[in-house]
Structure formats: structure tokens, C-alpha cells
Swiss-Prot record:
GO terms for biological process: keratinization. It comes from Mus musculus (Mouse). The keyword Oxidoreductase does not apply. Keywords: Acetylation, Cytoplasm, Keratinization, Repeat. The modification N-acetylserine is found at residue 2. Residues 1-67, 110-238 are annotated as: Disordered. This is Small proline-rich protein 3. It comes from the Eukaryota. Transmembrane segments: none annotated. Cross-linked envelope protein of keratinocytes. The gene is Sprr3.
Amino acid sequence: MSSYQQKQPFVPPPQPEQHQVKQPCQPPPQGKFVPIATSEPCHTDVPQPGNTKIPEPCSTKVPEPGNTVVLEPDYTTMPGPCSTNITEPDYTTIPGPCSTNITEPDYTTIPGPCSTNIPGPDRTVVPGSCSTNITEPDYTTIPGPSSTKIPDPGCAMVPGPSPSSTSEPSSEPCSINVREPGYMNASEPTHAKVPDQGYTKIPDQGSSKVPEPCQSRVPEVCPPTVTPVSAKQKTKQK
């Protein structure tokens, strides 16, 4: 009896305890978590205002106005006026007046007056004045005094006293010493200067400047130094 009674209370009490524990644990979480806690209040309180405030306005404000405001007006305003305003007026304003104003007046103003004003007066003024002013007075002034000064005093100084003292011996040395260099000095530069004018019209300055001073300086200095010494010595000796 004692053994049977002790065994019976051990077996049945754990069974109802297990049933009692499982029953209250299973139904309350199903009823609390599913309809009340997780689904209804969480979705209504947290995600609804979050979806309405964060994604809805962001999605509506960013892509919708962005596509309409940025893309549409940008493509219409940027390439539209730029392509129409820049290309059309630029090609008409920049190359149009430049090509008409620069090329046309430049070719008419620059080469026109330059060709008429520069070469025209230059060719008429430079060679004309040079040939008339340089060649003519130079040949007239240089050979004139040189031919008159050299032979005139030579003939007057030397043959003057020579015929009074002795005609024959005095005339011979006078003719040899004076007349020969006189004819050489007078005739050579004159003959050389007469054809030089014709030849020196083309190289005006080159030929006129070089031979003239050389010929004028050499004969002018040489005859007065030689002739007066010989004339004075002959007059004194006689």
C-alpha cells in the first residue's frame, strides 16, 4: 500500500503540471505578438510615418522635380539658346564684319595708296632729283675749278717769265713740265667725267663719290708743289 501510494502521486502530478505550463505559454505569445504588438501598432506607428516622411517625400521631391526641373529645362535652356544664340550671331557678327571690314578696306587702303604714293613719288623724286642735283652740279663744280686753277696759274707762272729771259730753253721745260700734267689733269678728268655722267646715272652715289675726291685731291696738290718750285728755280737761275 505504501509503495503503491507513493508511486501514484509521483506519476500523475507531473502530467498536469506539464499541461498547465504549456497551455499558458503557447496561447499568450500568439495572441499578444501577432495581432497587437508586432503587426498592428508597429506598422501603424513606426513604418507609416517613416514611409510617409522619409521615402515618400524624398522619392517625390528628388526624382520627380529633379527630372522635370533639372533635365527638362537644362536641355531646353542650355543647348537650345546656346546653339541658337552663340552659333548664329557669332558667325554673323564676328566673321561677317571682320571679313567685310578688314579684308575689303585693307586691300583697298593699304596696297592702293602704297602702290600709288610710295613707288610713284619715290621713283620720280629720288632718281630725278639725284640725277639732276648730284650729277650735274658735281661735275660742273669739280672739274670747273680744277681745270681752271691748275693750268691757268701754271701757264701764267711758268711761261710768263720764261719768254722774257730765254724763249727756247724756257718754253721747252714749261711745255714738258706744265703742259703735259696740265693736259693730263684737265683732259683726263673731263673725259672721264663726261662719260661717267652717262654711266653713273644708274649707280648714282657709288661711282660719283669714289673717283671724284681721288681725282680732285691728287692733281690739285701735285702740280702746285712741282711747278712753282721749278719755275722759281729757273727764274732765279736765269
